[in-house]
Curated annotation (Swiss-Prot):
This is Bifunctional protein GlmU. GO terms for cellular component: cytoplasm; membrane. It comes from Pseudarthrobacter chlorophenolicus (strain ATCC 700700 / DSM 12829 / CIP 107037 / JCM 12360 / KCTC 9906 / NCIMB 13794 / A6) (Arthrobacter chlorophenolicus). Acetyl-CoA binds at N397, Y398, S416, A434. Mg(2+) binds at D114, N239. Its cofactor is Mg(2+).
Length: 492
C-alpha cells in the first residue's frame, strides 16, 4: 500500500551530466522512452509527491535542457552547477538557490534526470519512511542479482546503514553484498545543509561526493536508514543507448500490461508500443504491430491495427483503423480507415465515414457517411455528408506558389480519376464523369464532363511504330480481320 503523500520541502533533480556514452549531440536526459524525455519522466515523478519547491541542476548543453524543462514545468527552478564537480556540489548549489527564496525545513529529496522508471509511489514511500522514523538520511536501495559496478550498502548489526562502499573500493566479502545504492535520497534539510558545508574534494576524483553526507550525518548523531525496493527497474539509469532501449522496452511492457488489466485487448504485446501519454477506453482492440504515440486516444470498441502507427490521433467509438500511418487527425465514431492509408495532420473523418486503400489526406474535413474508398489524394478540402469520391480522385491544391481549397458538397458522386483544380466548389448532389478535370465550379445537381468524344485513328501504331512488337501484333490482327470472309446464309 502506497503511503499518503507527505509533501516534502523540496525535490532536487540532478541533470548536469554530459552523458558521453550516449554518443549523441542530444543531451542524455532529453532522449526519450515511452514518448517522453527521461527528464520528463523524472519531473512527473517529482511533482506527484507535491513538493513545496522543485529544482533541477543543469550544466551540459545548459540552454537545451533548461528550455525543455521550462516547457514541461515552468515553475521548476533551474540551477546551474558551477566549476566544482560532483553530486555533492550539485545538491549544494540547488539547496543554496532554494534557500535564497525561503530557508528549507523538513525533507529534501534528491533524484536524477536519467532514471525514467522511478515512480511517484516509490518516492512517496521513501519520504513517508524518512519522516516516520525521523531519519537524518534515508537512502533508496535495490537488491540485484549482479551488483557489479554498484556501490554496496554497508549495514551495522542493528540493520542501520553505516556507509556506502564503491565497487572499486570494496573487499571480496563486501562484493558479495547484493544491496546497492540507487543514489536517490531523502535528507533532513538542516542535516544536509550542515554536512554539505563539510564535504571536500579531497579524493581521487577531486569531486564533492553526496555519499559523504551519510558518514557526516552519522558522526553528528543522526540516523541513516534505507528503503529497499525489489523492483530494480525503478532505480535503473540509462548511460548508453543499450540501457536506454532496455528501459524503454520495460516501460512499454508495463504500460501494455496496465492497459490490458484495464480492459484493453492487446493481441500481441511484444509488437505493440504505447506511449505513456496515450489514453484508451475499455474494449479497445489492438492488433499486432500497432504503435500509439503522443496524445492519441482510442474510444470504446475501436479496432486499431495490424501494422498501424498513430501519433496525436483521436479514434472514435467503434472505428476501425487498418494498416494506417496517421498523425494529427480525428477519426469519427464507426468510421473506417485503411488499409495502406496515410492520414496527415488536419484530417477529420466524420461518423461512419471511410478513407480506403492507398489514400493520402491532409487538412481535409470529411462529413458523416462520406467515402473516399481507394487510390487518391485529398488535401486542403471540405467534403460534405454522404458523398462518394470515386477511385483515383485528386484535389490539385497547389499552383506552385500557393495552396487552394476544394469544397465538395453533400450527396456528391464523382467518377473515377476526377481531378479538382482548386480553388473550386462542387454543389450538393452534383456528379462528375470519369476522367473529368474540374476547373470551374459545378452547380448543385449538375453533371460535370470535361473530355471530348473518343476518336480512333485506325492503323496509327503500325504506321508510326514500325518494327515494334505492338506494331507486329497490330498488323497481324488487322490482316486477320481483313482476310476473314463475310458471313453468308450458305455458311450458316
Amino acid at each position: 500500500m502506497i503511503p499518503e503523500n507527505t509533501g516534502p520541502a523540496a525535490v532536487i533533480v540532478l541533470a548536469a551530466g554530459a552523458g558521453t556514452r550516449m554518443k549523441s549531440r542530444t543531451p542524455k536526459i532529453l532522449h526519450e522512452i515511452g514518448g517522453r524525455s527521461m527528464v520528463g519522466h523524472a519531473l512527473l515523478a517529482a511533482r506527484s509527491i507535491e513538493p513545496r519547491q522543485l529544482a533541477i541542476v543543469v550544466r551540459h548543453e545548459r540552454d537545451l535542457v533548461a528550455g525543455h524543462v521550462a516547457e514541461l514545468d515552468p515553475s521548476a527552478a533551474i540551477v546551474d552547477q558551477d566549476e566544482v564537480p560532483g553530486t555533492g556540489r550539485a545538491v549544494e548549489v540547488a539547496l543554496q538557490a532554494l534557500d535564497a527564496k525561503e530557508e528549507l525545513t523538513g525533507t529534501v529529496v534528491v533524484t536524477y534526470g536519467d532514471v525514467p522508471l522511478l515512480s511517484g509511489g516509490l518516492l512517496a514511500e521513501l519520504v513517508a519512511t524518512h519522516e516516520r522514523e525521523a531519519n537524518a538520511v534515508t537512502v533508496l536501495t535495490a537488491v540485484l542479482d549482479d551488483a557489479t559496478g554498484y556501490g554496496r550498502i554497508l549495514r551495522g548489526e542493528d540493520g542501520t546503514v553505516t556507509g556506502i562502499r564503491e565497487h572499486k573500493d570494496s573487499t571480496d566479502e563486501e562484493r558479495l553484498i547484493r544491496e546497492v545504492n540507487s543514489g536517490i535520497y531523502a535528507f533532513d534539510a538542516a542535516v544536509l545543509r550542515e554536512a554539505l558545508g563539510k564535504v571536500t574534494t579531497d579524493n581521487a576524483q577531486g569531486e564533492k561526493y553526496l555519499t559523504d553526507v551519510l558518514g557526516l550525518a552519522r558522526e553528528a548523531g543522526g540516523r541513516v536508514a534505507a528503503v529497499v525496493t525489489a523492483d530494480r527497474w525503478q532505480v535503473e539509469g540509462a548511460n548508453d543507448r543499450v540501457q536506454l532501449a532496455a528501459l524503454g522496452a520495460e516501460l512499454n511492457r508495463r504500460t501494455v500490461e496496465a492497459w490490458m488489466r484495464a480492459g484493453v485487448t492487446v493481441v500481441d504485446p511484444s509488437t505493440t508500443w504505447i506511449d505513456s501519454s496515450v489514453t484508451l477506453d475499455e474494449d479497445v482492440r489492438l492488433l499486432p504491430n500497432t504503435q500509439l504515440h503522443g496524445s492519441t486516444s482510442v474510444a470504446r470498441d475501436a479496432v486499431v491495427g495490424p501494422d498501424t502507427t498513430l501519433t496525436d490521433v483521436e479514434v472514435g467509438e467503434g472505428a476501425t483503423v487498418i494498416r494506417t500511418h496517421g498523425s494529427g487527425s480525428v477519426i469519427g465514431p464507426r468510421a473506417a480507415v485503411g488499409p495502406f492509408t496515410y492520414l496527415r495532420p488536419g484530417t477529420v473523418l466524420g461518423e461512419k465515414g471511410k478513407i480506403g486503400a492507398f489514400y493520402e489526406t491532409k487538412n481535409v474535413t470529411i462529413g458523416r457517411g462520406s467515402k473516399l474508398s481507394h487510390l487518391g489524394y485529398a488535401g486542403d478540402a471540405e467534403i460534405g455528408e454522404d458523398t462518394n469520391i470515386g477511385c483515383g480522385n485528386i484535389t490539385a491544391n497547389y499552383d506552385g506558389e500557393k495552396k487552394h481549397r476544394t469544397v465538395i458538397g453533400s450527396g456528391v458522386r464523382t467518377g473515377s480519376n476526377t481531378v479538382f483544380v482548386a480553388p473550386v466548389t462542387v454543389g450538393d448532389g452534383a456528379y462528375s464523369g470519369a476522367g473529368a478535370v474540374i476547373r470551374k465550379d459545378v452547380p448543385a445537381g449538375a453533371l460535370a464532363l470535361s473530355i471530348a468524344a473518343q476518336r480512333n485513328t485506325e492503323g496509327w501504331v503500325p504506321a508510326n511504330r514500325p518494327g515494334s512488337r505492338s506494331a507486329e501484333l497490330a498488323q497481324a490482327a488487322i490482316n486477320n480481320s481483313s482476310s476473314t470472309p463475310a458471313s453468308t446464309e450458305e455458311g450458316k
